[in-house]
């Protein structure tokens, strides 16, 4: 669980602090999810307070060690981030200050994997560069699956680690350790981005210099905000025709509503792109060497960009003045900030989630990637500067701050599972303590004791064995039976961490192996895929006697069918795609239903009275009892609620789940001998079905946020295609050589759209879809769906 970005500290003492310290602490400190010491320290903090605090902490350090004292304070008082940072052991503080846990996220084809390939090359992690769609048949390092290399897309997030050497102002070299995750861009694999951002401290958001902010950029922005992840931005593809980096900067400000400003200005663009000018140090930076591995810096700024440099530096300072107090004060006094002041302000604002600095370059052309790596060091937080909260099960799940000290009891989160040749591989982020090979850990979900047989650091599909991993690091372990989102501790603490957001599937397919002898391998594959991917669901429909797989889109399911063939040698037959329809009640309907079966032996008797009505929102269903006088006992009401939720799983209209329906039971009757929990459960289900049909109910269909991009010459053809599918066009943008249209379309109407779009645009158009909301079906479509469902039921009864 992450804390809100800004909350005031409670007016309580850190175990044993004097009241004078508490008062000052309450007045002068704020807690943020991401905060450096510079962000948190109050300029008005009294020296007396600091003296008392230092003395008190020194006494504690002598008595029982800083780590234990801070753990005690964290458990009881929501310890401030400043106290954690300032009381780190110097060795530990030095280690953490040189760690960055970052992800690379962006829209499809923005160059994430190409950029990651350069990062690995420039940090010395790989010895040669290979392209995503390269002619050498090797493929990018981070695309380790054959399918990824064939299709030229990232399907699974891939983790690696590398070391970056950065020179400080004095020319001294400092080595920084990066734990890096490359994520997919396609919306069908959004869970990979979701779970990566859940455990990362910062991110690089990549944008295309031609297209700017695109549909999946908006999705990635939403995910970063969900987990309060600070980000720097990198405008890639500066060598492409039509490149306009400042359009991307404006779109970050306007579309994403996030203050942004360029910290670099490109020297040339398109095929004349040469390098960049650093607006903070006012130096021109060029790449040299066969792969751009050498950097050349000069204070001579080209004449052709001098006016742009002055204008954009002024814009940078103005934007920072809006989000940072120190720069605002200098701006009012009309004083020019120094290089150190600008860097400190950008760091504060970025970590405080109020700003994103924008870098520029071209990964494919090997230009200006290294300055972006310096930006990761300068502006993204280290693990000690990030506030992560756990829930203490021993204290009614009260929030408690995790402290990144290696000497404290272990707390780690399993965020991804993957099958390998050596068994199940579990990716873990260690938030507190140390994870050691051979140690026993406890799964907080089921209190199961587990031994850690092997710990590895991942480099795409390669691994490097290690004996231990400290707080703030990411690793993988073998032979651990767990689920994605499980919390691991060493058993001393009753902590658990909240899991990541998992979107609901929107599309299903019936599937079966072509050959019955492959049934065992088919079942094994299905179990593995479900364990690895929370958005991939497998169900068995008893009525149709079919296995159904559900996921985020056609590509998502096609990939798993293909993986079944390649990895398990199982050819499958699939049915046509099935839309995840929903049903909902129309009007308020009262019911008085009696279930009575008495034929000599034990009978059934249950009477339920009440009403059903819409909740007003198309989300969870609600059951409520308003019994007065005990006409139905508590255990039977429990059975009524169970019956209601079972009935909601399979609606009366077309057999799909019910949304936005409320049932209230306010009266009823029981029989001394014939009433049972089963009879009340059945009576509630019968009352539900009858009342639901009388309420003028509706079938709901999923509406998809659809974004189509194609060359401008095909605009009319694309609009015509969407209109034929009854799409609602919300907006469109026309660029120099391409246009983008934003629309809401029913998922049912979009089947086959991919091939039609290719035909209409000579293979040059592309589109993305993301679930938006549920909407009532057109009456004719609802009528057809109900008729089809009734016919299928009648056919089954004949059998």
Curated annotation (Swiss-Prot):
Binding site for GTP: 106-113, 182-186, 236-239
Pathway field: Protein biosynthesis; polypeptide chain elongation
SMART domains: EFG_C (SM00838), EFG_IV (SM00889)
Protein name listed in UniProt: Elongation factor G, mitochondrial
Key words, A-Z: Elongation factor, GTP-binding, Mitochondrion, Nucleotide-binding, Protein biosynthesis, Transit peptide
SUPFAM superfamilies: EF-G C-terminal domain-like (SSF54980), P-loop containing nucleoside triphosphate hydrolases (SSF52540), Ribosomal protein S5 domain 2-like (SSF54211), Translation proteins (SSF50447)
Taxonomic placement: Eukaryota, Fungi, Dikarya, Ascomycota, Pezizomycotina
Family: Belongs to the TRAFAC class translation factor GTPase superfamily. Classic translation factor GTPase family. EF-G/EF-2 subfamily.
Main location: mitochondrion
GO molecular function: GTP binding; GTPase activity; translation elongation factor activity
GO biological process: mitochondrial translational elongation
Function, in words: Mitochondrial GTPase that catalyzes the GTP-dependent ribosomal translocation step during translation elongation. During this step, the ribosome changes from the pre-translocational (PRE) to the post-translocational (POST) state as the newly formed A-site-bound peptidyl-tRNA and P-site-bound deacylated tRNA move to the P and E sites, respectively. Catalyzes the coordinated movement of the two tRNA molecules, the mRNA and conformational changes in the ribosome.
Organism the protein comes from: Aspergillus oryzae (strain ATCC 42149 / RIB 40) (Yellow koji mold)
Gene3D superfamilies, sorted: 3.30.230.10, 3.30.70.240, Elongation Factor G (Translational Gtpase), domain 3, P-loop containing nucleotide triphosphate hydrolases, Translation factors
Stretches assigned to the tr-type G domain: 97-384
Database matches in CDD domains: EF-G, EFG_III, EFG_mtEFG1_IV, mtEFG1_II_like
Coiled coil stretches, renumbered: none
PROSITE patterns: G_TR_1, G_TR_2
Record Pfam families: EFG_C, EFG_III, EFG_IV, GTP_EFTU, GTP_EFTU_D2
